[in-house]
């Protein structure tokens, strides 16, 4: 399963973002999925 917009993600181990999203780690300490459009 993948996670969507605003959900917590981890680029190195998952959970991974759904298609159309990328894992943004700017808002530490957690990474969150952002729309990549």
UniProtKB/Swiss-Prot annotation:
GO terms for cellular component: extracellular region. Keywords: Amidation, Disulfide bond, Ion channel impairing toxin, Knottin, Neurotoxin, Secreted, Toxin, Voltage-gated sodium channel impairing toxin. Expressed by the venom gland. It is found in: Secreted. Belongs to the neurotoxin 07 (Beta/delta-agtx) family. 02 (aga-3) subfamily. Changing residue 36 to A: No change in binding affinity and in lethal dose. One of its GO terms (biological process) is envenomation resulting in negative regulation of voltage-gated sodium channel activity in another organism. Changing residue 30 to A: 58-fold decrease in binding affinity and 5.1-fold decrease in toxicity. InterPro entries: Beta/delta-agatoxin_fam. It comes from the Eukaryota. Changing residue 34 to A: 18-fold decrease in binding affinity and no change in lethal dose. This is Delta-amaurobitoxin-Pl1b. Insecticidal toxin. Binds to site 4 of insect voltage-gated sodium channel (Nav) and inhibits channel inactivation. In vivo, it lethal to lepidopteran larvae. Has no adverse affects when intracerebroventricularly injected in mice at a dose of 0.2 ug, but causes reversible paralysis of legs when injected intracerebroventricularly in mice at a dose of 2.0 ug. Disulfide bonds join 2-18, 9-23, 17-33, 25-31. Changing residue 3 to A: No change in binding affinity and in lethal dose. The record marks 19 as: May be involved in voltage sensor trapping upon activation of sodium channel. GO terms for molecular function: sodium channel inhibitor activity; toxin activity. The modification Serine amide is found at residue 37. It comes from Pireneitega luctuosa. Changing residue 26 to A: 16-fold decrease in binding affinity and no change in lethal dose. The presence of a 'disulfide through disulfide knot' structurally defines this protein as a knottin.
């Amino acid at each position: 399963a993948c996670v969507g917009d605003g959900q917590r993600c981890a680029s190195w181990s998952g959970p991974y973002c759904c298609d159309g999203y990328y894992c943004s780690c700017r808002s530490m300490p957690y990474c969150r999925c952002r729309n990549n459009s």
